[in-house]
């Protein structure tokens, strides 16, 4: 048992440098181990010679990590072949088994984990003996189940690759009456494991902020002669048809999120006061009609501009006849509509 205590001390001494954090939750791992296998309390019957209790041990294992603290492992262990000699009999003993254990761990740091395993091993033990007196040889084997206890530390080399330093103890491997011995075994091993599904999750990319809405301003000019009879402010049928066409264009600009200003203009025939009033009435007629079509009343306004800002300039100064002057000044008689609307900017998703 003194050797067992030494082995446990060596295992714990590796704590500071050989360890790993537990795998991610609900992932699988597999690995292999190699180390020093030592048999204890061998007590061979009719054996009074040397027994080679220290052997090479090895194994393979696989496991499922439930969470950082709990996992389950299943593995195969080769515990080594132990020769012995005596004055009457020489022989060898070997043992191997399949174990199933619960693995209880505790993370010390992001890369360091200390753990214990508790469970059982289904083993097979074989002996081969040669009688030095009679020259006869015999082979025997035994099977059974024994408890398994293990403790160790793990260290993450990479997210997928891990190492472990472990000491494992298995009780009573064999029946002395069947195979001549009933030893215990301590296995100090260094293992390497590969853990599946440890890749970093794809980073969550924050969606790009929605582009600021684009404000568009458009100007429309309608001839008053199309909208109204001369010197009148009541819309003609053809004027309503013209505004119907205009409304479809305004809808595309979404005036509900913008504003509409209707500007009425007259020519220079008549007094300034009269022309100002006529331009206001004409602008209001257009506003009323567009409101009836669906433009919100709080988003549209009328403004009379009178005879200001003539577009004909001085081209009609020499026209004296009234009918001809009315025709010449027709471009000045107009309704201008200024629309400021919100246009949604649609961005294409990146591939």
From Swiss-Prot:
The lineage of its organism: Bacteria, Pseudomonadati, Pseudomonadota, Gammaproteobacteria, Enterobacterales. Keywords: Cell outer membrane, Conjugation, Disulfide bond, Ion transport, Membrane, Porin, Repeat, Signal, Transmembrane, Transmembrane beta strand, Transport. With TolR probably plays a role in maintaining the position of the peptidoglycan cell wall in the periplasm. Acts as a porin with low permeability that allows slow penetration of small solutes; an internal gate slows down solute passage. Monomer and homodimer. NCBIfam families: PRK10808.1. It is a multi-pass membrane protein. This is Outer membrane protein A. Residues 206-213 are annotated as: 4 X 2 AA tandem repeats of A-P.
